[in-house]
C-alpha cells in the first residue's frame, strides 16, 4: 500500500507534459443480472489506510488528495474477490460533495485475500481546527446487488483514529 502512495507522489513530481497529477480512482464495479440469488459478500477487515488530504505546493498537484484502503477477506480467493464491489458512505467529517465516489468501486487485488480501493479528489475542506477527520463505512456488495455488513473506516490528519486493527 505504501508503494501506491509513493507512485502517486512520483507522478505528481513529473513535469506537466508527463503527468498533470490526474485524479485516480478504483474502477467502477458493475452489477450483473443474477440467474440465482447471490450470497451475501464476506465480511471485510480494514488492514491499512493511507490518507493524504492534499498535496503540497507542487505545480501540478496542489490541493489534490487521495486515500487508499486495504481490506482483507477471510477465505476469499483473488478470483472471487473480483465479484465483490464496495460502496463508500460518509458517516462524519466529509464536508465537500463529490469527494467520495457515488458508484460502487471494484477492488484491486493486492495480496492473497487482500484488496485495495482508492480514489482522489481536488480540494478538501478541513474541520475548523485545520485537521481532516473522516469516518466512513465501506459496504461490500455482490454482482447481483446484495449488500454485506458495513465496515467502519477512520482517516484523519491527527491521532483521533484507532489503528487499523482496532477498527
Listing of model-derived features with the role each one plays in the protein:
Residues 146-158:
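Extracellular fibronectin type III
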Residues 97-113, 154:
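Solvent-exposed serine/threonine-rich low-complexity stretches and specific carbohydrate-binding patches
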Residues 123-132:
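Surface-exposed, short loops/turns at beta-strand junctions within beta-sandwich domains
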Residues 74-100:
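Solvent-exposed loop/turn segments flanking beta-strands in beta-repeat/beta-sandwich domains
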Residues 20-70, 159-167:
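Short, compositionally biased P/S/T/A/G/V-rich stretches that sit at domain boundaries
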Residues 111-122:
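Aromatic sugar-binding surface patches on proteins
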Amino acid at each position: 500500500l505504501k508503494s501506491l502512495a509513493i507512485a502517486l507522489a512520483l507522478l505528481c513530481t513529473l513535469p506537466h507534459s508527463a503527468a498533470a497529477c490526474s485524479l485516480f480512482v478504483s474502477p467502477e464495479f458493475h452489477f450483473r443480472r443474477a440467474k440465482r440469488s447471490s450470497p451475501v459478500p464476506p465480511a471485510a477487515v480494514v488492514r491499512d489506510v493511507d490518507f493524504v488530504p492534499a498535496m503540497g505546493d507542487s505545480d501540478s498537484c496542489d490541493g489534490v488528495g487521495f486515500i487508499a484502503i486495504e481490506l482483507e477477506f477471510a477465505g476469499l480467493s483473488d478470483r472471487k474477490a473480483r465479484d465483490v464491489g464496495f460502496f463508500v458512505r460518509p458517516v462524519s467529517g466529509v464536508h465537500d460533495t463529490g469527494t467520495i465516489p457515488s458508484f460502487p468501486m471494484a477492488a484491486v487485488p493486492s495480496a492473497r485475500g487482500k484488496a485495495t480501493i482508492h480514489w482522489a479528489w481536488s480540494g478538501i475542506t478541513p474541520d475548523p481546527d485545520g485537521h481532516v477527520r473522516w469516518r466512513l463505512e465501506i459496504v461490500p456488495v455482490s454482482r447481483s446487488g446484495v449488500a454485506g455488513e458495513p465496515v467502519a473506516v477512520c482517516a484523519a490528519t491527527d491521532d483521533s483514529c484507532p489503528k487499523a486493527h482496532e477498527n
